A protein has these predicted regions:
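Mid/C-terminal beta-alpha module of Rossmann-like enzyme folds, strongest
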Residues: 200-261, 275-278, 283-311
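Conserved glycine-rich Rossmann-like NAD(P)H-binding loop of the short-chain dehydrogenase/reductase
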Residues: 27-37
């Protein structure tokens, strides 16, 4: 378990979960490279024996020496939210170019690329466009690797999705739902996804593109109800017209450069996406955690449920 694993962008949702699970399995030579200082500090506190460097992986520098002797790279870096297109280019596209070059130059033998289900989405937003370009770069690189396309994920350290929704629920007198709330989601438990990544690492799965979606279809409003139950929240859930919800988000964005939820993400929420469900439990030898159990683990785990990352 001493092979060197490098995780660019490893201080985010997937990275923090992956490090925790790798450590539980006995992996001891893990390097995390991430530019989000606050989340880097969270990782240093929760996993003090992991090598963590706060760097911008879109800019070549001395940090590339961490690829020397690496056995595995799991490419995790991603700009998910925001309103500045150039941030998506820098963090999703430019960074990928730098890392792919490093993998080739340093002769790293194995790569796992984390793409996104949005590359097949009908949505057209900054995240979708940049992730499509990123995946195309990986495919064109000539590096044979598994490409994993997860849907919306939740779990420990979730700052952006269900984690933010749960904290928002604790702070407001009522919880607003756009329209009727019947927007079908296929949420993926990040614990399951990390076990898929580990399966790739341990079995050196070769080239292929895999759509990794949650095996349960759950409407947005029912996700909120499950969060309410798991956190014992008393906040009432209130439906408001879609147009008003959109206007409120637009107004919020005028005062917040990096809002937790944008009008583009609202449009993506209401897009009628249904992603392919493959037999990833059979393919990767990983069982699917029932949604209700996964929600309970997310919000009630004694080790990590109270750890919160920054946006």
């Amino acid at each position: 378990m001493n092979e060197k694993i490098v995780l660019p962008g490893g201080a985010g949702l997937v990275g923090q979960n992956l490090v925790a699970r790798l450590k539980d399995l006995g992996y001891s030579n893990i390097v995390v490279l991430d530019k989000h200082r606050a989340n880097v500090e969270v990782l240093r506190k929760t996993q003090p024996d992991v090598v963590v460097e706060c760097v911008d992986v879109s800019v070549p520098g001395e940090w590339l020496s961490h690829f020397d002797g690496a056995a595995v790279v799991v490419m995790l870096q991603a700009q998910i939210g925001g309103t500045d297109w150039q941030e998506f280019v820098r963090n999703n596209v430019d960074s990928t170019r730098v890392i792919l070059d490093a993998i080739k130059t340093k002769n790293v033998p194995y790569l796992v690329h984390i793409s996104s289900s949005v590359v097949e989405s009908v949505a057209d937003d900054f995240y979708t466009r940049s992730k499509k370009e990123q995946e195309e770069m990986v495919l064109a690189s000539g590096i044979p690797c598994p490409i994993l396309r997860p849907t919306l994920m939740f779990g420990w350290f979730d700052r952006k999705h269900l984690g933010w929704l749960s904290r928002f629920m604790q702070r407001v007198p009522v919880f607003p739902i756009p329209g009727n709330g019947r927007y079908m989601r296929q949420p993926l438990y990040v614990g399951d996804f990390c076990r898929i990544i580990i399966s790739c690492i341990e079995n050196r799965r070769g080239a292929g593109v895999y759509n990794i979606s949650g095996h349960e279809k759950v409407d947005y409003i029912d996700i909120i109800r499950e969060i309410k139950q798991a956190t014992s929240s008393k906040t009432p859930i209130v439906r408001i017209p879609y147009g008003l919800f959109y206007a409120l988000l637009w107004t919020w964005s005028l005062f917040d450069k990096n809002p937790p939820f944008t009008t583009q993400q609202l449009a993506a929420l209401s897009a009628k996406d249904e992603f392919e469900v493959i037999d990833w439990p059979g393919t990767f030898g990983v069982s699917s955690t029932p949604f209700k159990k996964a929600i309970d683990e997310t919000f009630n785990d004694p080790r990590y449920s109270s750890v919160v990352l920054e946006f």
